[in-house]
Amino acid sequence: MALDSAKKQEIVTKFGRGENDTGSSEVQIALLTKRISDLTEHLKVFKKDHASRLGLLKLVGQRRRLMRYFKRKDKDAYLKLVAELGIRDNI
């Protein structure tokens, strides 16, 4: 399920560097994390939805690549973001 614009704007203002900052790594990782958690909840109910499972795996891979890049560029901000989002630092 896609994020509605209000929820997306809330995430952008919380994690972005500016008001309309949608391209920074922090915002992209936060948006992907929200989409991943929504899809995970969906798959708990619909266990045989393999198309959504494939989409979930693609999102996780995309987030992993972004996190690897962000960790390499700004380690302190990366650790803060990981703690704030409540995700593991296994990259």
From Swiss-Prot:
<dbReference type="GO" id="GO:0019843">
    <property type="term" value="F:rRNA binding"/>
</dbReference>
<dbReference type="GO" id="GO:0006412">
    <property type="term" value="P:translation"/>
</dbReference>
<comment type="function">
    <text>Forms an intersubunit bridge (bridge B4) with the 23S rRNA of the 50S subunit in the ribosome.</text>
</comment>
<keyword id="KW-0689">Ribosomal protein</keyword>
<keyword id="KW-0699">rRNA-binding</keyword>
<comment type="similarity">
    <text>Belongs to the universal ribosomal protein uS15 family.</text>
</comment>
<dbReference type="GO" id="GO:0022627">
    <property type="term" value="C:cytosolic small ribosomal subunit"/>
</dbReference>
<protein>
    <recommendedName>
        <fullName>Small ribosomal subunit protein uS15</fullName>
    </recommendedName>
</protein>
<comment type="subunit">
    <text>Part of the 30S ribosomal subunit. Forms a bridge to the 50S subunit in the 70S ribosome, contacting the 23S rRNA.</text>
</comment>
<dbReference type="InterPro" id="IPR009068">
    <property type="entry name" value="uS15_NS1_RNA-bd_sf"/>
</dbReference>
<keyword id="KW-0694">RNA-binding</keyword>
<dbReference type="InterPro" id="IPR000589">
    <property type="entry name" value="Ribosomal_uS15"/>
</dbReference>
<keyword id="KW-0687">Ribonucleoprotein</keyword>
<dbReference type="InterPro" id="IPR005290">
    <property type="entry name" value="Ribosomal_uS15_bac-type"/>
</dbReference>
<dbReference type="Pfam" id="PF00312">
    <property type="entry name" value="Ribosomal_S15"/>
</dbReference>
<dbReference type="GO" id="GO:0003735">
    <property type="term" value="F:structural constituent of ribosome"/>
</dbReference>
<comment type="function">
    <text>One of the primary rRNA binding proteins, it binds directly to 16S rRNA where it helps nucleate assembly of the platform of the 30S subunit by binding and bridging several RNA helices of the 16S rRNA.</text>
</comment>
